[in-house]
């Protein structure tokens, strides 16, 4: 009898396990699971990008088959020369798409099929490309550029899959139990003769359609005041190993350093959690026995004025623990799914949770938040009902609540479509994998990712190039210049006792305010569709700076010893291409000439023919292209990386130039008069208005 009972138990247990596995939705997310060739209803009609219609930049499916959660379409591509596929990297047994974290990477190809082959070299410091991705840029055989991007609907998400035969499939799904219904947005498409216009026009169309985004252009957003100043972050110095005493000691060391750090960002390591799930918005009591009070008491208007805190969008890395100390009314805004508590299911409940979340941080005294792990919020909901809508509501609630409370927001690990297309108010997002001290190949890859991803993300936010060490002996100075020209936040992560002033002071004025470009730096046209770590060529980026200049950095990012020396160049065309970065009336009239100012050598020359430069090893060269008008070319304060951003041109005539100097130092001005040319150096001992005569 016992044996029969045991057999029945085994059979019953087997039925239970099998039933549980069958009951699990195919989109339920877990580490190591991939979604390649996911089961989908194949639509008969293909999406033909050869018949692109400019008046319809966002394609919608008007006739969704009944009772279907996932559809797939064959995409017919026009003839192309080369392209970029934007997807995360793929590691066995690791998290996969759509948890893109900070890893939406630009994978270069001549044929899409290359991305599926083991021989594909990829980007150093990363694994092979994921064949599931969010965007595609093609240089077409007819000279045009085509940009295609996945979109999120009310409760649907699309994505691309590169197939082993080199074809492209588009998927669209609810990512859960719900069925697709109504008009479903499929993808965004733009074509243009200009690669910059392809991106600009695409995002204009995206922003204009509230069914697929909740966005504003970067230029229409308010940049949070704190991020205009130099900061310091705990992460790369301590990683998780932080506590109250260490942070207070570091604040003392920062103030003693003489470097005007104006904000401190307390990164991960403070969160009360159980098994990487949030248990309280009060910090770990062992590490922070007095809460945040003693640290907040250190804020001073003319020293460290602002303090920010790291948190995860979904609570902590794996969500919210059932063993939490939230008030009963907040407990009611959460529901249990797949081993975690999640905000929802209704929009009102999600808003209520994030109101409590953000107001609690505000009450603690924090001025801004770095909200990380955003791309993992969607996977936490996957396989359930209203997956995309709930994940999107989390992003929107974060935007609403930080905006309403007057708190700044830095978005991090926020590179899936739901995240990127719903930054309604926030103006800063991380654009690359973490920077690592003393890691040359990682630094090269970091720069490549940051600038290329800015082509997309820079349409709606300022790019955060991550923190850096001024004391990095491999690339501290080079990284400082990249942070300057990025236009995003600049924050250190050295031990304050190791600050290298020579790599910091050229970034800022005496108060710690950063000299920033007018728009984020992006690759020059010839650098967009190449992998500079493998090309054997130079890599160039540029940004508009000051009232009328274009600043350019030329890099050698090659990893092969055979390409230790490469040639680069500066030419007049670079200045005129600058107006394609940001539509501006500043470039409406042609200059009389262009001055190329070599920041390293502190020399200037009229740029007539192309200027050739030799780049030895992992290095960079910074130039400012300044227009000559009425015999004047304004370069700016020579000691600062972005010299043109240090002055404002108030007026000029053939005889006089009037400027407003934003900092002290040596002002460089090019002067032409009576057939003579002069690079004039003028000491500036106080800020304000200055008149210069020829």
What residue ranges belong to the model's regions?
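C-terminal beta-strand-rich structural cap/linker in extracellular carbohydrate-active enzymes
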Residues: 607-647, 667, 676-694
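N-terminal accessory beta-strand-rich subdomains and adjacent acidic, glycine-rich linkers
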Residues: 25-208
